Every structure is written in C-alpha cells, then in structure tokens.
C-alpha cells in the first residue's frame, strides 16, 4: 500500500479549511467527490441526503467493506481557539483546526487507503462514505448508504489513538417534564411551581445507581438543558418545566427500561411528571427529511469475532499495536479505528501528521 503522504496532508487541510457545520456540508462533500475522482475511484456520487460515496471494485467478486467518516462538524468560536479553527495550520507535527480529529483527518486517511488498494488482488469491493448530519442525528445517513451497498463490514474512523474499538455506549436524549399550577408571584400560595417540582426530580435522578459495563464504562445521565414555561416568567409562577438529559446506554438497555428507571425513583410519589425520549426532525442540505427517535442502542462485539480478529491482524501487520478497546452501527460487524485522541475531538482539535499517515 503506497500512500502519497504530502497529498494526504494537503487534502486533509483542504477539508478542514471548508466550514461544514451540520446542514452546511455541500462544499466539503463536493471536495470529497472531486478527490475521489482524482484518485481513480471506480464510482463516486452524492446520495439523496447529501453524503458522498465512492467505490473501489476488485478484480474478483467478494465481500464489501465500507469505511465511513462523517464530514460535518460542531460549531467553532474563533476566540476560543489558539489557532484559526479553519486554518489547518501545521505547527511541528500537528495540524490544528475544527474537524482534524473529528473527523476530516480520519476521512481523508480512509479515502487514500481505499484508493491505494491493489485491485488485482482485491476480491470484493471497498467503499468510502462521507456522511452528513452525524453531529445532529447519529445513524440515519449512514444507514441509507448501507441499504444501498449492503456491506459485510463497516469501519468507522472515529478518534481512537489507532486502537480498534469493538463496542460503543449508546445514547438517548431523555426529556422530563414537570407540571405545576400557575399563579401570580404576589400570591405564591395559590400556585405550585413546576421548577421546584423539577428540582425534586433532578435530585432523585442524581441519586440513581449508575451501572457499569467492564468494556464500555458507566451508563450515566447528564443534565444538558432546563427551561420553564412561561418564559420569561413576568411575575407568573411556572406551571411547566422541561429538562433534557443525555443518557449514555449500555448493552441490553431499552427505551422502556431507561424511562421506567426514572419513573420509579423513590420520593417522587406526589410529583406530577412525565418522561419521554426526544423525537428528532432535521433536514439535510439537500432538503431531505430525517426523522427518528433519539435513542441509539449500545452494542459490542466479542474480541473473538472474525471481523474483529481480521481487523486486529490488519493493524498489527501495519506495525500498529492493534489494542482492542470500545466504541457504532447495528446489523453488521462495525469496529472503529482512527488517528488522534478522543479527548481532543472538539475544542482546540488537532491531529498528528505521523498518526494520520499511519491511519
């Protein structure tokens, strides 16, 4: 496998220099397609949701391997950065910029790796997808590509320090709503403040036991926002209050078990509250609709799984440690491996050039 490292670095810089916040990925997707054509992919196209897909065909029939990386990023406030988030500046062996680690550097490495495959020796095909909207809604744009390609295995290029992740915690956006009784603030005894009721629920949730998976870690809940109604209050006691939690899921947890655990909290017998999972509705930059419950189950594969073992052998043959750890997809073998560290995916994101080349 011969990779032109200078071209890989230049391509990564070009991706980082194109802002591609969720729902604004059109320009970066077009840049990906341009590079796929330049590198000799047999087919490259943009699907209905706006994701880029490229395919390398082998000389003989065989399984399909899909390499996936999302091309959207979270936002960036330049004042919070020590380097221009869209400058792709190289200092020493590090490239700085939004998306270098999560996950434009990883995506670029996968595109170049696929392009370098010896077609004469390849039985099957290698595909690469640059999916959109992942930061807002995980999964549906990747699933759409899988429904077309029917891959036998998927590798997702998340930041793993080049280890192989064989499992991942799931995630749910849990909404809790409390109900009270409105009254003017001059007569508080006539009302029941939904905010005070929410405080009781929050305290009960904080007291819930956190389950721990030996591979995936803890299945915790984090409060991410809270708002009362009416807002602003204007001297009116709130009759409703809504809080959103980010709940990290472990294998075997379902929507029902997650909500029942909150509903059955001790000490909330007199509190009028309800729980639900947020239903997401988004439009991609092409105008296509994405709709789904924001409940993404956890998953993990045994270390002995044939695809996991095959991936480990590949890492080790490339001179990497091939350590097996945790991290996304349902229905087929889906390990993850990529350059950089999970800790630097967002604020001050950077990627080591040497690690990018190894990826």
Q: What label would you give each PLM region?
A:
Residues 103-169, 173:
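Acidic/histidine-rich catalytic neighborhood of metal-dependent amide-processing enzymes
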